[in-house]
Structure formats: C-alpha cells, structure tokens
Amino acid sequence: MMDPLDNGLFDLPDYEHTEDENFPPLPPPHSPGADDEAEDVANGDDWTENAGQTQREEAPKPARRVVKRPQPKLDGQRLASQRGLPALRHMFDDVKFKGKGHETEDLKILLRQMENWAHRLFPKLQFEDFLNRLESMGNKKEVQTCLKKIRMDLPIVHDDFLSEEVVVQTEDHAIDMPSEDFSFPDELHVPSPSQPVKVDLSEETLQRIERNRRLALERRMEKMQAQAESQALSQATQSDPNEIPDDAFDAEMLDAVESMTGIPTASQSPPHVDKDLSLVLHSHDLPVQDVSQSPAPCPKPQGDAPPEKALSLVHSALPSTSDPTSPRKPLTEQLPDDADTSSATPYTEAPACTNTKEEY
C-alpha cells in the first residue's frame, strides 16, 4: 500500500502566497425583471454599472393633487345665482294662503316653502344653520346688488334677458340702380348710417312700465301738495291778520293824546270861556294873556318826544282838581248849562297852539 503522506494527499496548500479569487456579487432578491438581470449576469454583464441608471428611470413621479368633486360654498355669488334670491320672486306664484283665521297654517306653508328653497340652494346645512349663515352674508356687495335689482324689477339672471323678446329689424335702404354694372372705387363707398332699432316689448312689461309711471306721478303730486301746504302755513304764521300794525297804533295814540291835552284842530270850533273862570283867575292874581295880544309861540318839541311824555308835562302843569285848596274848579262845574249857552259871550278865536303854563 502506498502511504498517503508520501503521495502528498494531506499537504495543505500555501494560502499565504496565493491571492483570493474575485467572485461577482450576489444577485438582488427576486423581483419583476429578475430573469433579465440573471441573463445579464450569466452573460457576464455587471449589473452594478447600470444600477444608477435603472433607479433614475424607475423613480416615481410626484402625484398631482386633483380635486375630483369640489364642495360647493355658500357665498355671495351662489346666493345671487338662479337658485338663490332670484328664485324667491316666483316661488309663491302657485301657493294659495287661506287668509284670516288660518294664520298658523299659512305660516307653516310659508316656512315649508322657504325650507325647500334653502335645501335646493345648499343641501349641506340645516335650515336653522342656513338662516344664520344667510343673515351674516346680507352685507356683502353681491347680495346687496341682487336685492336692489329685485326691488327695481330689473333682469338678473339669463332667463330674464331671454324673456324680453327684443327684435331688431333693419330696413333696406338700397337705391335702385340701372341694369348696367358700374365699378366704383373703394374710396367712394360711404358706410351707411345706423338703422333705427325697433323694440317689441311683451304685454307684461308694458303693464309694469305703466304701473311704475303712475306710481311716480302720484308720489310727485303728493310731494308738491305737501310743499304747497307748508308754504301756505309759513306765510300764515308770518302775516297774522289779528296783529295790529305799528303805524295804526301810533295814530290811535296820537289822537288820544290830542283829545286829552285839548289841542284844537283846524276843523274844530273855538272853545267857549266861562266868565266865572276868568274871575277866579283874577282873584288869585294869576297872569292872564290878553286876547288882543299875539299868542305866544308854541315851543317846538325836542326831538321825537313820545305822546306819553307830552301828556305827563300837561298834567304836571295843570293844578289838581282833587285838592280843596286848588283854585281850579272841576271840569263838571266849568262846563256851562244848556240855558246859559245862549247868554254866554263867544270867545274870540284861540290860537292854534298856546303855552299852557303862561295861561294859568
């Protein structure tokens, strides 16, 4: 038998001086397209070289965010749309209320119609929440504009414009030309003037226009009547017929003063002087002006003295009749009787104005 040691069967190889073999890396786990990669590896292609390029090609793109069903919003534009406030104009055309005595039932019908309108406009909200949202949106510009158009009976939505049947007709103003063909240059062609537009309105529109015109005339007449009444009242308060004018009052006061002071006028007869009065004046040694002498000039009034001041001066100059020691008799005693009127000697014409202080 042969010895295995002799044959060198158990000799270990010299790993210190040998180099490791280069083995290809392990393939990736099984995935779609792994067979192709296995074939590449079998064919000697290195998949690591194309790894970066494969990742760039297979990188997923960011998905675009698309809203498929946008949720409706209760804003001013939706409230002014065809299902919004304009729909309320014709909602109660077919509704019949029972009238007096059935107010509760009529109110239920009204609320039911309003709830139906709110649900059609925005089904997402309950009726109470819809009313709260509607109240907060009343100040928006779109809502205010829509309300003004409704009050003025103006067209709002597209159907309102279609209901107004407007027919525009153009008339043919062509001039009869001869049968021969004439060629005119382009410079001589003048554009035809604008043709008159004939508008045919419906009967309902004409009735509405007539009603608005009548209401405007009534308001104008009421306004003019109110202005006329106010002007008449102001004129009546300014010129009161019961008020006495100042010039009439001054004339009456002047006549009263003249009658009390005893100043005769040109139309009055000269006064009669009693003999007893002259004797009394001589007994008290009072100076009496001679008739034959010229009358003393009447003093001119200083400024525009009021009649009350002249009256007070006259009363202060005359002696009092209530005093028993006064030399002047009462006027009742000075007046002559009817029997003595014929025997009394008439006095000569007295001057127009005498000095009262010098006479007495």
From Swiss-Prot:
GO terms for molecular function: DNA binding. Residues 1-80, 178-199, 220-246, 289-360 are annotated as: Disordered. Residues 62-71 have a biased composition (Basic residues). Residues 74-150 are annotated as: Interaction with TIMELESS. Keywords: Cell cycle, Cell division, Cytoplasm, DNA damage, Mitosis, Nucleus. InterPro entries: Csm3 (IPR012923), TIPIN/Csm3/Swi3 (IPR040038). Residues 225-239 have a biased composition (Low complexity). GO terms for cellular component: chromatin; cytoplasm; nucleus; replication fork protection complex. It is found in: Cytoplasm; Nucleus. Residues 34-48 have a biased composition (Acidic residues). Its main location: cytoplasm. GO terms for biological process: cell cycle phase transition; cell division; DNA replication checkpoint signaling; mitotic intra-S DNA damage checkpoint signaling; positive regulation of cell population proliferation; replication fork arrest; replication fork processing. Interacts with timeless, which impairs timeless self-association. Belongs to the CSM3 family. PANTHER family: TIMELESS INTERACTING-RELATED, TIMELESS-INTERACTING PROTEIN. Plays an important role in the control of DNA replication and the maintenance of replication fork stability. Important for cell survival after DNA damage or replication stress. May be required for the replication checkpoint induced by hydroxyurea or ultraviolet light. This is TIMELESS-interacting protein. It comes from Xenopus laevis (African clawed frog).
